[in-house]
C-alpha cells in the first residue's frame, strides 16, 4: 500500500526558466522520504537518526523527468516500497501535479546504516515490518 503526501512548489525551488530546478526535485523527494517513515513505520526519521542512530542513505537512483514542476503546483507524491532486502530498501516515487499529470518518477535504493560508523546493518525488524506493509501491490 502506497503512502500519499503533498507539498507545493515554492519560489526558492525555481530556476531561471521559472520551473523547479532539477536538484530541488531530488530535495523535495527526500523531504517526502523523511515524512513517509511515520505513516509507514510509526517512527519519525529524526527519531531514527538522532535517537536510534539509524540512517538510510541513497546508493542508487533511476529517475525520469517527465514534465516540469511549476511554481504554485501542488505536488502529490505516491511512495511505495518495491523491495526490502537484508540491509537495503527499494523505494518507488511518483510525483503528480494537481491535475493528475505525472511529472517525475524515480526508483531509489537506500541502505540501512549505523549512523556512528556508517557501516551497513540489517533493517531492524520493526522497520522491516512497516516497510513490508507498504510493498507495491499490497492492499490493507
PLM-predicted stretches and their roles:
Residues 1-76, 82-140:
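Terminal targeting signals and extreme-terminal segments of soluble enzymes
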Amino acid at each position: 500500500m502506497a503512502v500519499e503526501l503533498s507539498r507545493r512548489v515554492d519560489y526558492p525551488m525555481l530556476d531561471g526558466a521559472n520551473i523547479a530546478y532539477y536538484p530541488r526535485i531530488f530535495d523535495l523527494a527526500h523531504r517526502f522520504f523523511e515524512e513517509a517513515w511515520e505513516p509507514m513505520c510509526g517512527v519519525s526519521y529524526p527519531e531514527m537518526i538522532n535517537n536510534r542512530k539509524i540512517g538510510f542513505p541513497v546508493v542508487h537512483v533511476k529517475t525520469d523527468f517527465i514534465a516540469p514542476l511549476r511554481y504554485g503546483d501542488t505536488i502529490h507524491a505516491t511512495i511505495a516500497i518495491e523491495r526490502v532486502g537484508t540491509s537495503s530498501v527499494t523505494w518507488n516515487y511518483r510525483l503528480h501535479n494537481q491535475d493528475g499529470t505525472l511529472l517525475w518518477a524515480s526508483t531509489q535504493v537506500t541502505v540501512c546504516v549505523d549512523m556512528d560508523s556508517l557501516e551497513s546493518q540489517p533493517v531492524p525488524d520493526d522497520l522491516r515490518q512497516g516497510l513490508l506493509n507498504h510493498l507495491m501491490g499490497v492492499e490493507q
